[in-house]
């Protein structure tokens, strides 16, 4: 069971220092993939192992999970993976993150908290203001991948991203993964659970234009 954390809590107003790319990674020149809401980070650990030609950054709002993930990175001496604790909206909207955002080539939102009650929609990670921040900072060609097993949440995320002029939908059938990064080659724990239980998965790809 996922532990729900209120991202609007004042506890997340203070942002930890974001290291430079050279501090986070062995080779700061590699393309950078960002996973928002990375949980324990197993998805990124697997990606970092499968595709070593990229750097990976995970943002997670549960501090204990981030501490454990950082310890694993240290123990395994992984040079292309880093984790940051906090609210992604606050972190990426902070001035110290601007340079990092401009180096991001793709972002994934995998099975984010649905926050089913309407009064809690404002707690969802994808908000119009957040998408505006991304549209203003991301380079052209940057990809966004969303994936969920909750149809209502998918529709909400799709409307929110699609309403921003700077992002266009890409038909998955026409998307050439050989020419771009493919985070879908690795499945999250939630996705494996959904597949085993034959639950529908809703996903979409967007590009910054």
From Swiss-Prot:
Q: In which pathway does it act?
A: tRNA modification; N(7)-methylguanine-tRNA biosynthesis
The entry's cellular-component GO terms read:
tRNA methyltransferase complex
Q: Which UniProt keywords apply?
A: Methyltransferase, S-adenosyl-L-methionine, Transferase, tRNA processing
Task: Please indicate if the UniProt record lists tRNA processing as a keyword.
Answer: yes
> What does the record list as coiled-coil region(s)?
none
Domain of life assignment: Bacteria
**Organism from which the protein derives:** Prochlorococcus marinus (strain MIT 9215)
List the Gene Ontology MF annotations in alphabetical order: tRNA (guanine(46)-N7)-methyltransferase activity
HAMAP family, A to Z: tRNA_methyltr_TrmB (MF_01057)
Give the protein name, as stated in the record.
tRNA (guanine-N(7)-)-methyltransferase
Q: Which family does it belong to?
A: Belongs to the class I-like SAM-binding methyltransferase superfamily. TrmB family.
**Which function does this protein serve?**
Catalyzes the formation of N(7)-methylguanine at position 46 (m7G46) in tRNA.
Per its record, the protein catalyses: guanosine(46) in tRNA + S-adenosyl-L-methionine = N(7)-methylguanosine(46) in tRNA + S-adenosyl-L-homocysteine
Where does the record place the catalytic residues? 113
- Where, by residue number, does substrate bind? 117, 149
Concerning NCBIfam families, the annotation shows: tRNA (guanosine(46)-N7)-methyltransferase TrmB
Enzyme Commission designation: 2.1.1.33
Q: Where does S-adenosyl-L-methionine bind?
A: 35, 60, 87, 113
**Pfam families (alphabetical):** Methyltransf_4
């Amino acid at each position: 069971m996922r532990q729900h954390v209120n991202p609007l809590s004042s506890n997340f107003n203070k942002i930890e220092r974001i290291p430079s790319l050279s501090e986070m990674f062995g080779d700061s020149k590699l393309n950078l993939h960002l996973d928002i809401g990375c949980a324990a980070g197993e998805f990124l650990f697997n990606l970092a192992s499968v595709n070593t030609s990229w750097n990976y950054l995970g943002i997670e709002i549960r501090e204990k999970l981030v501490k454990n993930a950082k310890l694993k990175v240290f123990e395994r001496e992984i040079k292309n993976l880093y984790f940051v604790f906090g609210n992604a909206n606050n972190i990426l909207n902070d001035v110290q993150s601007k340079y990092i955002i401009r180096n991001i080539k793709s972002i994934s939102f995998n099975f984010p908290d649905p926050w089913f009650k309407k009064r809690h929609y404002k707690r969802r990670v994808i908000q119009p203001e957040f998408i505006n921040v991304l549209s203003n900072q991301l380079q052209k060609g940057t990809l966004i991948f969303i994936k969920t097993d909750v149809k209502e949440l998918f529709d909400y995320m799709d409307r929110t991203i699609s309403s921003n002029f700077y992002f266009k939908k890409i038909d998955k059938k026409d998307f050439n993964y050989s020419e771009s990064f493919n985070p879908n080659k690795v499945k999250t724990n939630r996705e494996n659970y959904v597949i085993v239980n034959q639950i529908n998965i809703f996903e979409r790809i967007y590009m910054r234009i």
